[in-house]
Amino acid sequence: MITCLRIELSKAFRNGWFAVALVIGCAFGLGCAALYAIPSVFSTFVPNPDKFYHPTSQSCFNAWISVDTTSWALLFYQVLPLLCVIPYAWSFASERKDGYISHAYTRVGRGEYFFAKYVAVFLSAGAVAVLPQILNLVTLACFFPGYVPSIQDANYYAPVFWQSVGSFLFYNLPLAYVALYMLIDFLLCGAWAGFVLALSLVVHNRVILLTAPYLALLAIQFVNENIFFAIGKVRGFQLSLFENLHGSCSMYIQNGWIIVGEIAVFLFMAGLFWVSGGKRDAL
């Protein structure tokens, strides 16, 4: 078991697709930090050295990509569910096509192989989700101090409202808020990638395997954003995976139970597929 897990982790974190996904994610992280820092430093502070600015408004936490509402930050979370499946969620489909799993089944049991594969996919997806956000915050901290945000900034700088998940932490212990959303994104992306991996038991084409679930997420987001307008007089809730990965809310405020439910559904569906997959012939 340990050897199989070590092999799968090595394959997941040392393949070129993991590097591609991570570089793209880090480019978003650095780009969003630069787009916030450069105008603030060279267009606001340098030309007006004697002007007072409310200290909390220039906190690195207010500018963190997870609470940033600029177009590039929103685009990052829009493509994140696709980025996190690129590193290794396709591996089972590829190994089945190449005949590798037949050899793997003779060396380790199917259960051990499936478990090691799932853990590798889960961890690589979580890393792709979290590392760019850490890089973004560290870069911003090089330009702006870590002031504790003020609730007065909610309407102007950081749209984290009192109903938002973890809002108390954001305005009291911002590092704990960062850790909370890192954990949420790690679990959501890991569970999502594991679900896509499980779909490879019935979807053999790797391009369809990675793109079809993503298109389904876009469809769910479209329905979620429009159905409450169509119904009228109904308080909306956030079902979109894209929006639940993002700390700040755009249309509907996140609900912690819905986020937990999404993680549970992805894990449950992946478990069903793996149980059924264990009964199938390797060929």
Cite the ranges covered by each PLM segment.
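Secretory targeting signals
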Residues: A27-A93, V119-L197, L201, F237-G261
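Membrane-interfacial segments
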Residues: P39-T44, A93-R96, Y100, T139, ...
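Hydrophobic core positions of alpha-helical segments in small-molecule transporters
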Residues: V20-I24, F115-A116, V128, A212-P213, ...
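Helix-loop-helix units of permease transmembrane domains in multi-pass membrane transporters
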Residues: S91-S124
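Junction motif at the cytosolic side of a transmembrane helix
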Residues: A198, V202, G261-L283
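Membrane-helix interface segments
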Residues: G16-W17, G109-G111, F115, N205-L210
